[in-house]
Amino acid sequence: MSETIKILTIQDISCYGQCSITVALPMISAFGIETAVLPSAILSTHTSGFSGYTVRDLTEDLPAIRKHWEKEGIYFDAIYTGFIGSIEQFEYIKDIIDSRLKPNGKVFVDPAMADNGEFYNGFDQDFADKMGELCNLGDYVLPNTTEACYLLHKPWKEEFTKEEMLEMANELSAFTKKYVILKGDTHKEGKLGMIILDKDEPSNAEFVYNDRINKMSHGTGDVFASSFVGATLVGKAPSSAAKLAGELTKKALEETIDDPTHNYGVKFERVIPSRSEDTSELQSR
């Protein structure tokens, strides 16, 4: 029997709303990966579509958690960061990566801080610059075009050409140890795509496309990132993992699109079985 892969995901918990840890934990676990969590904050709901939500920042808890893990000899094969609660947490998270990641372990950074040309509530360019420092530790960095523009200090626009996407991915390679997965390529009609660039082989960059669903929904980035992380860790190549993650995200949107009352995420739970079938051969190796 092969040894179980162990991953730590660091991001917030929204008690209600399908995003962040409440997506990452079941999605990655379904790949047969043991998934530990480190909440950066606890919110009563996610921040989109709700008002008056409560937030408990957990920055002060991070050092004690890391110290306890050190005492217990707890290490991880991979670490995946998502929504980070405050700018003060970056140094603690970098320390956790440095001290709790096994040799040759992999780091996935989803710089979840912006979309549609705007920062999420509470974030600014200083936060983006700190996020760039965290991206430097990542073997895989997964920004959308808005996040990429903030990382690069470039103006954002709704549409980028294929050539502009490639140029931006090459510029982003300075922020990663290995791979850039740049999401949000819309130049192909009826398709939503991404570019996968290996900084060691930039001339072999790949574009991957899935059918486009014309619905904006909270949490789709988390479904994509979690699926990509899981598929990569069980052996899929980055382009294959990105294709699978994009397909699962599309299916989750399709499950949600006809329910106008479901405005707090996508029904990702309904696509987990089909994703498990897609990866069953890899899980049994």
Language-model region placement:
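Short pre-catalytic strand/loop immediately N-terminal to key active-site residues, enriched for Gly-Thr
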Residues: 15, 204-219
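Conserved N-terminal subdomain of the carbohydrate kinase-like
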Residues: 2-109, 113-121, 269-278
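Glycine-rich beta-alpha junction loops
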Residues: 14, 41-43, 85, 113-115, ...
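Conserved phosphate/ATP/ADP-binding segment of small-molecule kinases
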Residues: 121-205
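Generic secondary-structure signature for well-ordered alpha-helical cores
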Residues: 33, 67, 71-74, 98, ...
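Short, small-residue alpha-helix embedded
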Residues: 150, 215-238, 242
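Charged C-terminal helix
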Residues: 239-285
